[in-house]
Structure formats: structure tokens, C-alpha cells
Amino acid sequence: MDGFGSSQAPAAYREVEWIADVFVIGMGIGWIINYVGMVYGSLKGRTYGMAIMPLCCNIAWEIVYGLIYPSKTLYEQGVFLSGLTINLGVIYTAIKFGPKEWTHAPLVMHNLPLIFMLGILGFLTGHLALAAEIGPALAYNWGAAFCQLLLSVGGLCQLISRGSTRGASYTLWLSRFLGSFSVVISAWLRYKYWPQAFSWLGKPLILWCLFAWLVVDGSYGVCFYYVKRYERRIGHDSDRKTV
């Protein structure tokens, strides 16, 4: 599966291919920082940071394009496998500490391992079906866009429904945002300099996905700021009452 490079690339793209490669590495760095930070924050706060369904979708995508349809580019393959490995730690912390976040829903609280197993299996078959329908190279990109939207919406909903920043931080938000934004830059370079293969990146649905992601992830930063400020105010008021 060719994700970001191919022997068929025109000369115009080959001149800027190294820039696209740098942003692919930037994507990997951003997401690895995010995953490691998520595991660390989960262990420290005894909670989990990524919403359940986005986590299942994300790890299923990494399995498909890290193991089943691996990239022909070594560094890209390394990014995916590194992310997959660390993501297993994210799932571990979610299963270990998730029950206390779901005391209001016993069915979820007592069945998190089963929910994760079924969720990953469901998204895994979905990604494979998409690859069979439109080909692995296209499905790789469309699947990534879906994962990103689901992750952004899930993260925002989790922050709002919890009314708390536990399991989250500015570092996690920014590393996720910068990692995903690196993908946007590399995709733009392919669209600009390799239109024969990537002109579809300028289609309305892709542009809508990009706009929706920017709005949702931008909103996450704003909501995080206000939730954090509320937590500080409540903590300050509590401190004054105990004096």
C-alpha cells in the first residue's frame, strides 16, 4: 500500500517529497507524544483519556495499515507500528481505570473488555471492507479522515460530559492537533504536486472533513480552557470555605 510515496510520482512531486516526508515524521512524533502522554496521564490520574469508540476505530485502522496493508516506506511503517504498540497501553489504562468513570452505567462498567473487543472487531472489519471496496490506498486516507473526526468529536463530547479535565491536558490536545495538521500539509503537497493521483483530495467531502475537524478541535481547546478555569474557581472557593 502506497500512502505517501510511490515510484510513479511525477518529477514535480519528487522535488518536494522530502518536505512531505518531514511532515509524515511530524505526524508520528505528534501522535506518539499524544499516546505516551495519555498513558502517563491515565496512570497518574487513574482514568483514561481517549473516548472508547474513537480508540477502537483508531487502533483498528493502525492494525489494518500497519500490519495487513503495510506501507512500502520504512519510516511510515515505523510510525504506524510505534503508534499501534503504544496504543495498546492506552487501551490497557482504559480497561483498568474505565470502570470508575462508568459507575452511572453498570452495563458499561462491568463489560469494558468485551466492549473494546467488539468495538475493535467492528471497526477492523469496517476498514477492511472499505479497502476491499475502493482499494487500500484510498481507504487508507478516507479511513484516517473518519478516525480523526470520530476522535475529535469523541474527545470534545467526553470533555463536556465529564465536566472535568481529568485524563486530558493542553499537551495532549496540542500534540494531537499538530500531528493531524502535519497530515494536512503532506496531503496538500500531494494534491498540489501530484494531481494525477491525488486530485480527489480537493473534493467537497474531504474539504468538509477538514473544516469540521478544525472547528471541533478548535472548540476543544476553548472548552478545555473554560472547564479548567471552572475547576480552578471551584477549588479556590473550596479552599476559602475551609479556612
Swiss-Prot record:
Keywords, sorted A to Z: Lyase, Membrane, Transmembrane, Transmembrane helix
Signal peptide (residue range): none
Give the induction note.
Answer: The onset of expression occurs at 48-hour-old stationary cultures and the steady-state levels correlates with the onset of aflatrem biosynthesis at 108 hours. Expression is regulated by nsdC.
Keyword hit for Membrane: yes
| Localization | Membrane
Q: What class of enzyme is it?
A: lyase
Q: Which InterPro entries match?
A: PaxB-like
The membrane topology term of the UniProt record is: Multi-pass membrane protein
An annotated Gene Ontology molecular function: lyase activity
Q: Which regions form coiled coils?
A: none
Q: What is its EC number?
A: 4.2.3.-
* GO CC aspect terms: membrane
This protein's record includes keyword Membrane: yes
Q: Which residues cross the membrane?
A: 19-39, 48-68, 78-98, 112-132, 134-154, 169-189, 205-225
Q: What does this protein do?
A: Terpene cyclase; part of the ATM2 gene cluster that mediates the biosynthesis of aflatrem, a tremorgenic mycotoxin with acute neurotoxic effects. Synthesis of geranylgeranyl diphosphate (GGPP) by AtmG (a GGPP synthase) precedes condensation of GGPP with indole 3-glycerol phosphate, followed by epoxidation and cyclization by AtmM (a FAD-dependent monooxygenase) and AtmC (a prenyltransferase) to produce paspaline. AtmB is also essential for paspaline production, but its exact role has not been identified yet.
Family, similarity comment: Belongs to the paxB family.
Name of the protein in its database record: Terpene cyclase atmB
The organism's taxonomy opens as: Eukaryota, Fungi, Dikarya, Ascomycota, Pezizomycotina
